[in-house]
Amino acid sequence: MSGFYHKHFLKLLDFTPAELNSLLQLAAKLKADKKSGKEEAKLTGKNIALIFEKDSTRTRCSFEVAAYDQGARVTYLGPSGSQIGHKESIKDTARVLGRMYDGIQYRGYGQEIVETLAEYAGVPVWNGLTNEFHPTQLLADLLTMQEHLPGKAFNEMTLVYAGDARNNMGNSMLEAAALTGLDLRLVAPQACWPEAALVTECRAQAQQNGGNITLTEDVAKGVEGADFIYTDVWVSMGEAKEKWAERIALLRDYQVNSKMMQLTGNPEVKFLHCLPAFHDDQTTLGKKMAEEFGLHGGMEVTDEVFESAASIVFDQAENRMHTIKAVMVATLSKLNN
């Protein structure tokens, strides 16, 4: 793990394929050690700040449990718990927290915010999610894929992302494919494709590593032979209802359902989702979607697929913690370098 100590984790393309692979190997080891009761605390005495301008269940719990497992202490700064960007600049916040903490996690808005924190904090800064990238999620996804296709290299795997690919998930998947050589297919209406410049950059790297990146509106063509089908929510509570109708009309044909799974032609195809998922009407938003748009069986994924044996979403959720732990150990512990 040489080279990781005191390094930031802001986006995947900041790393080499070998570095990404070593992080995944460390995550797998830490997971095995935890389950066997042999985990060694390498972050004893470390203090970690968790800045959340956007709430999250999985990201917060993953960082907190990972830190506690490794002997570190955390301070949670929620959406109303800090003055960042309001009464105090990001630059000043970084310099204050950097004097008190050994590492800082940021989950919030623009990528420029986490980049500024990293520039001025003087300690490792980790991107828990920004509008542009979600690198910790992709680490968990890659570990989960390795676990479910043991013995297969990434450049022998086909990953399909169906839905709105313009977001941080689509961008981070492009970066993951660039580093691993995945056969990545973004199956989405053209209006929901990522920026062309990032696609071009990542496709060139993916091809050098034995993979490819394809963008298509054709569902049947896009999912053929897939090993994994991935999706994410189409709307959020913070958006105007007018956007809900527009987004649902645009993406309705890209819902992950049993027909899409069958179109892969792969009886072993697995379903991935970064969660939370609107697969039923048991949530406030899910109920609204069902009532207003007739999406009673699920929105971006049907309940049938979500609850099927093909669904490995809770393996993914668990792996958030193990991979985040690997990032913290690699960047904060001299014992691991």
Swiss-Prot record:
Keywords: Amino-acid biosynthesis, Arginine biosynthesis, Cytoplasm, Transferase. It catalyses: carbamoyl phosphate + L-ornithine = L-citrulline + phosphate + H(+). Its main location: cytoplasm. InterPro entries: Asp/Orn_carbamoyltranf_P-bd, Asp/Orn_carbamoylTrfase, Asp/Orn_carbamoylTrfase_sf, Asp_carbamoyltransf_Asp/Orn-bd, Orn/put_carbamltrans, OTCase_ArgI. Its EC number is 2.1.3.3. Pathway: Amino-acid biosynthesis; L-arginine biosynthesis; L-arginine from L-ornithine and carbamoyl phosphate: step 1/3. Coiled coil: none annotated. The keyword Cytoplasm applies. Belongs to the aspartate/ornithine carbamoyltransferase superfamily. OTCase family. This is Ornithine carbamoyltransferase. It comes from Shigella flexneri serotype 5b (strain 8401). The gene is argI.
